[in-house]
Amino acid sequence: MKIRRRPEQPPVAVGPLQFQLQGADVEPGNILEKIVWAKEQELDRWRERLPLAKLRARTASAPEVRNFLGALRRSPHPVAVIAEVKKASPSRGVLRSDFDPVALAQAYTRGGADAISVLTDEAFFQGSFTNLSRIREQVPLPLLCKEFILGPYQIYLARAHGADAVLLIAAILSDTDLAYLMRVADQLGMAALVEVHDLEELDRVLALEGVALVGINNRNLLDFEVHLETTETLLTERGERLAEWGITVVSESGIYQGADLARVRKAGARAVLVGESLLREADPAQAVGRLVEGV
């Protein structure tokens, strides 16, 4: 999967006036590309409001890092559960009309979740870093900042708001950027969940040093279709190597019932990231409990 960054279009002068012309290649080719291009512009606005030097200083007063990876590996469940807090998605729209991020995270905690994932993207998922901070203040579980991270600024932003782990999506990052951002996260004491969608991306990630946590996203981010076979296929091909190297595998998306957990567990996943199926339940705490008990 190849995701382009937004191309720069030089201004064209006509007399004293300048125009910004748009060519055919200035339009994003898919949903993920659209999100990435919007994120680049959003980052420019963040940097104007809060320069990196000031943001880095804020991380010094951030709450102590919790052990995200340890929580997954020490889970009392056959498959560790990362329960996701998000209000909406580009493919499904608003998922929960009575959305209360703190109450939702607390319900997940009561239900037996091992960690919480918090969507912070505002434009496409109606999330925020404020939600992350509020959840950190009220919930004892380790937190994953679910964001479309393009550079170190967002990792510092996540840490300043209380995150213990960050998501790094292989499809939108070069190998050099992945390696660098993993080091930044490690320097801050945070875990990096490196997400892949196909065998090519998984092989890229396995060629990097220091990878401890790999997420296999069953959702194709080009068209948002979900297939659990993605986890099964990749672990059939590389599961032995992942296990030999001690890498914890998280199966992401498409988990709706205990049978789905059992299926990805059999394939070799040690944890699952679950969002939509929990968000649509009247009682998210019971939903987490049923999911775990159904394995």
Curated annotation (Swiss-Prot):
The gene is trpC. Belongs to the TrpC family. It comes from the Bacteria. One of its GO terms (molecular function) is indole-3-glycerol-phosphate synthase activity. CDD domains: IGPS (cd00331). GO terms for biological process: L-tryptophan biosynthetic process. Pfam families: IGPS. It catalyses: 1-(2-carboxyphenylamino)-1-deoxy-D-ribulose 5-phosphate + H(+) = (1S,2R)-1-C-(indol-3-yl)glycerol 3-phosphate + CO2 + H2O. It is an enzyme of class 4 (lyase). Keywords: Amino-acid biosynthesis, Aromatic amino acid biosynthesis, Decarboxylase, Lyase, Tryptophan biosynthesis. Pathway: Amino-acid biosynthesis; L-tryptophan biosynthesis; L-tryptophan from chorismate: step 4/5. Its EC number is 4.1.1.48. PANTHER family: INDOLE-3-GLYCEROL-PHOSPHATE SYNTHASE, TRYPTOPHAN BIOSYNTHESIS PROTEIN. It comes from Gloeobacter violaceus (strain ATCC 29082 / PCC 7421). HAMAP family: IGPS_B (MF_00134_B). InterPro entries: Aldolase_TIM, Indole-3-glycerol_P_synth, Indole-3-glycerol_P_synth_dom, Indole-3-GlycerolPSynthase_CS, RibuloseP-bd_barrel. This is Indole-3-glycerol phosphate synthase.
